[in-house]
């Protein structure tokens, strides 16, 4: 660090803080937890994880992609404290995976499954935040829209609509071409407009805004008051078998999202040497273990904040550390200011985040890439929505493997006809799994023809494959079929 980089890191840290603040608050709210939990998660990610991370630019904190897992896990385990115990275990698992150098296995996860996972997270996030944006009361779930057990809040809808409009405007050339505005994050403006609507609306139309839910951050008069707000893990939860399923799910999905973010960030701003994925998993493991102890949300490296950090000119970790310090200061001494922010504004930010994860362009691109990409992609989405994150990812990977095996079998051998001559080209080593395809091709050879086998690219034939070829070779003379370059001996 020197004065030259500091001049770039300080404003970068401020911008990252402004982007992270509404996301930290919104993700906590979407998880059904107090907003302070989101700020605490951002502080741990910004200060602790950054200190151990090998990346100079990756920003860690609460991730929108884990919201659905957090909500489902708390519901499964019954209490937030039991979830925190699972989070401690998840952090330990991440640390062990880092020690075992498991980061390199990220390359084994198919791209179609990863994209499907992110799209499913986006869809679930949208489904979860629609009731909040509409000012849900009554059922409070999306299903309440169809059952009739749902009442709307006009003030919430107006605030959420204004937030979505601002977020859209901030992506248009009109705003991007205004340099002064292009540096201000759209989510921050959306939240500020919501806060101003609350402040001035209370004076002008108090009845209209009476039903507008807002953030409720506690005030901390002392460190003891802060400590009283922190919730610790329930160590008795070790008796619950579901805790270990949740811990493994959190560890795998958080690690996957972190390493994907790191790969994407390296394309935006290459580092030399390339940050070690194993060291990153160690850092994330430390952060998530501490988050579980202190009562925070799961932590991952997040591409949105990381890309902002790079785009505004960050040169070192100082910008990320500064954003963590600012989140801490904001949570400790400016809670009154944050308490004017309506939940509908945060819902707008999260709805837009969900849309970006599951944009229609992504579906169109996957369809254009063909069934081999689209089928595992859509299977992953359906699996995650219907059965949960781990089951959905497992289904997606299994579908990709089966489809790859199918295509490999189709491409392993080809039969070409030249008048009464047939050429059977074997393109790769064959196993017993290729027998049905081989038998079908051999059955296409008519009587009184010539069959030539091109097996120059084959080093190994399974004994079962040889048995099929030998059986055909012994019957061929009786059908008037002449064999050329036959790969097995016949009587």
What residues fall within each predicted segment?
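Membrane-embedded helical hairpins/re-entrant loop segments and their flanking transmembrane helices
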Residues: 2, 6-8, 19-56, 231-318
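Hydrophobic transmembrane alpha-helical segments of multi-pass transport and channel proteins
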Residues: 54, 153, 251-256, 289, ...
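Helix-loop-helix junctions within the multi-pass membrane cores of secondary transporters/permeases
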Residues: 61, 83-109, 118, 274-345, ...
